[in-house]
């Protein structure tokens, strides 16, 4: 049985990387029907956005996508394609397994951990205002009224929302993942000095 997978090659080194990935997948013998969709700087002229709706529709239909690196054109008013994909599909858990391999040359032996990171809040929320935007002035006034340290008039602003609900959701995900995969320990890491 073949599996339908959306492939977003991206731009820059993306097509080269995704082509190598395809060769690796093909070597496994797993049958894949690749639905190649273009996104990033290369589609801006044709579609007026780095992430056209038909790409989102294709991913929604297959529920599986592999994406290469994608450039978001700077100064175009568009958020990062990565952030847009995370928000659109609520891809809140970034799961990164880390496993030592024999002969890898690392000074750290027997590494076997999985990093689970919240992927839609904090700076990943993509709430940003360019220098000179009216929102920057409004935020500056709000900060000043609250008695906090002000920031330079020529600042750009990025807001880092962190909610109880989404914090709880990622913690629950980490514990469920640990149970499901037979892991015995979950460690929370955060920068408390930044958020006091």
Task: Indicate where each model-derived feature is located.
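Glycine-rich phosphate/diphosphate-binding loops that line cofactor/substrate pockets in enzymes
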Residues: 1-2, 59-61, 150, 171, ...
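N-terminal phosphate-binding or glycine-rich loops at protein starts, especially the Walker A/P-loop
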Residues: 2-38
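Short glycine-rich or small-residue beta-strand-to-loop segments that form or flank ligand, phosphate
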Residues: 4-10, 65-69, 186-192
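Buried hydrophobic positions in well-ordered alpha/beta secondary-structure cores of metabolic enzymes
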Residues: 11-14, 63, 116, 174
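N-terminal beta-loop-helix "entrance" segment that forms/cooperates
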Residues: 32-52
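Flexible, glycine/charged-enriched surface loops at secondary-structure junctions
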Residues: 32-36, 180-189
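N-terminal glycine-rich phosphate/adenylate-binding segment common to multiple enzyme folds
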Residues: 45-145, 155-160
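Conserved small/polar residues in nucleotide/adenosyl-binding loops
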Residues: 194-196
């Amino acid at each position: 049985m073949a599996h339908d997978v959306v492939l977003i090659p991206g731009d820059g080194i993306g097509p080269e990387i995704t082509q190598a990935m395809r060769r690796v997948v093909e070597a496994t013998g797993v049958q894949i029907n690749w639905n190649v969709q273009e996104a990033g700087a290369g589609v801006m002229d044709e579609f007026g956005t780095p992430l056209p709706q038909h790409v989102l529709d294709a991913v929604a239909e297959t529920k599986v996508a592999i994406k290469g690196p994608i450039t978001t054109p700077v100064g175009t008013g568009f958020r990062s394609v990565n952030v847009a994909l995370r928000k659109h599909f609520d891809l809140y858990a970034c799961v990164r397994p880390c496993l030592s391999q024999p002969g890898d040359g690392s000074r750290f032996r027997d590494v076997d951990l999985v990093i689970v990171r919240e992927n839609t809040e904090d700076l990943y929320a993509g709430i940003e205002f360019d220098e000179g935007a009216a929102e920057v002035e409004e935020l500056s006034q709000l900060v000043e009224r609250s008695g906090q340290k002000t920031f330079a008039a020529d600042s750009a602003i990025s807001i880092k929302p962190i909610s109880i609900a989404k914090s709880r959701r990622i913690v629950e995900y980490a514990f469920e993942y640990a149970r499901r995969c037979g892991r015995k320990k979950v460690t929370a890491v955060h920068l408390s000095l930044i958020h006091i």
